[in-house]
Each structure stands twice: as C-alpha cells, then as structure tokens.
Amino acid sequence: MNELIEKAKVLQEALPYIREFHGKVFVIKYGGSAMHDEELRESFARDVVLLKYVGINPVIVHGGGPQISKTLEKFGIKPKFVGGMRKTDEETMHVVEMVLSGDINKDIVALINRYSGEKIYAVGLSGRDGRLLKAKKLDKERYFSELGLPVPEEDIGFVGEIVDVNEELIFTLLSHNFIPVIAPVGVGEEGEAYNVNADLAASEIAGEIKAEKLIYLTDTKGVLDEKGELISSLSKDKAEELIKKGVIREGMIPKVRSALRALEKGVKKVHIIDGRVKHSILLEVFTKEGVGTEITLE
C-alpha cells in the first residue's frame, strides 16, 4: 500500500507541470548512451510517448557520430576531424546521410512507435524533406572565433549551418498527432546536402519554432562547477563567466553556446541532462529538483 501511495504522490507532483506545459513544444536532442543502451532507449521512447499523451509536443533531433565513423571505416574511409568537426567531403556526405537519415532515424521512429499506440505516430524526416532545414556551408571563421578556438586552415567540406527552418511542416505534423524525428542533414540552395551538428540543429529548430524547452540528453550530469559538482541552475551571464574562467570547457562550450543562442531566439529554458539516467526527461521536467542543469537568460 505504501508503494502505491508513493506512486500517487509522484503523479500529484507532476500535475502542475503537466498543466503548465500542456500544448507546448519541447525540442529534445537525442544522443549519447541513451541511443545505445537498450534499457535507456526504451526509457527514452516511453518518456517521449508519455509527453505526447499528456498534451506536450515533443520534437526529436538526433545525432549519430559514432555510427557514422563505424560505417565509414566499413567502407574503407578513414574519418577525419578538423577542429573537432567531421571533415565531410562528397563521399563522406553520402555515408553521413545514409546513416543519419536511413538507418538511425528509422530505428528511432520504430522504437517510439513500439510504445505509441494507435493514435500517435513518430515520423522520420531528414532536413532535406520538405526543405525542412535550409543550410549553407558553415562559416568556420565565425564559428571557431565564437568558441574562442583557433580557426583551422583546412577546408571542412560539406559541414553546414542552418539558415531557415520550415516551421509550417513541423507544426502541421504536431497538430496531427505526429512526433517528428529529425535527422540533422541540411539542404542547400542547389539541393546539395550538408552535415549539420545535431546540437546546433536542435538549437536552431527550437529557436525558430519558439519551443518552451530545449533538452539535451548527454553523457554527463549537466554543467559542472570548479569542484565537478552539478550546477542545477545557470543564467546567461553566469555561463559566459564560467566559459571565460575555463570552468565550462572542451565539448561543453559549443553545447552551452547553442543553448544560449536558442534562448536568445525565444526558447524559454534549456536543459542539459544526464541521458544515462532512466526517465531523465520526466525527472527533469516533472519534478522540482530535476536531474540536470537548467539554463535561462536571466
């Protein structure tokens, strides 16, 4: 009986959050261990379906770096990185698109649909479908300068940045009870494909559709302080300060930068959470304590 009472308390705790976020859009960047561990995959899918059934509209953007590297090696192509970004020549771009749009995307769609029932369906999209993600070649000078990193001289190939999002397509799908699952492959003016960083894609999509929340699933607890302890709440100014001090460093810098960009474009809150924790999305969104770092403008 006590266990049942505790479960009831959990539902009661979630109620005000369900009421507050009903009808709102959450963009979720899906990556890391949550994509590979079977229990975490199932936990993620169930969480996404639950969000939809309680009236929240999830939009999923996924990565796939490790799978791309493995597939390139199978084809005898050695993965190359320039300044931490995958050098994407034409041959590599074909593999990137094949893995992201054809393999990973459809696997995630099937996973969510396993739990979604008869009224809700996940649908897979590439950024090239319906010109969902219009892109151009990444301005590497601006990108690396903003991160405080030296600008590499080597050409990065078909690495892109998003210049426009087909909001109408996303909202049409959401209004018809679909859960969009988006592969971060952009389309250029001439129809060429671009490899877009999934964090940046999620940030741009969230900003353009003015999402209530942008949630990053990661393989870390969140943003950590000087002692390695989790920072539960972070403002834009504090984030900038921690970047300058070197507390926020390495791979967390571009993630936080993309979070700040989303906030500046109208997203209410960004959450960087530990995707290694089962049901981390629900714990972050529907409990007072949360399980990651919440980032806001002020």
Curated annotation (Swiss-Prot):
UniProt catalytic activity: N-acetyl-L-glutamate + ATP = N-acetyl-L-glutamyl 5-phosphate + ADP
Pathway(s) of this molecule: Amino-acid biosynthesis; L-arginine biosynthesis; N(2)-acetyl-L-ornithine from L-glutamate: step 2/4
This enzyme's EC code(s): 2.7.2.8
Residues at the site labelled Transition state stabilizer: 29, 255
The keyword Glycoprotein is annotated on this UniProt entry: no
Binding site for substrate: 64-65, 86, 195
EC class: transferase
Gene Ontology molecular functions: acetylglutamate kinase activity; ATP binding
One cellular component term from this protein's GO annotations in UniProt: cytoplasm
InterPro entries: AceGlu_kinase-like_sf, AcgluKinase_fam, ArgB, Asp/Glu/Uridylate_kinase, Glu/AcGlu_kinase, NAGK-C
Source organism superkingdom: Bacteria
PANTHER family reported in the protein's UniProt record: N-ACETYLGLUTAMATE SYNTHASE, N-ACETYLGLUTAMATE SYNTHASE, MITOCHONDRIAL
Family: Belongs to the acetylglutamate kinase family. ArgB subfamily.
Protein name: Acetylglutamate kinase
The species this protein was found in: Aquifex aeolicus (strain VF5)
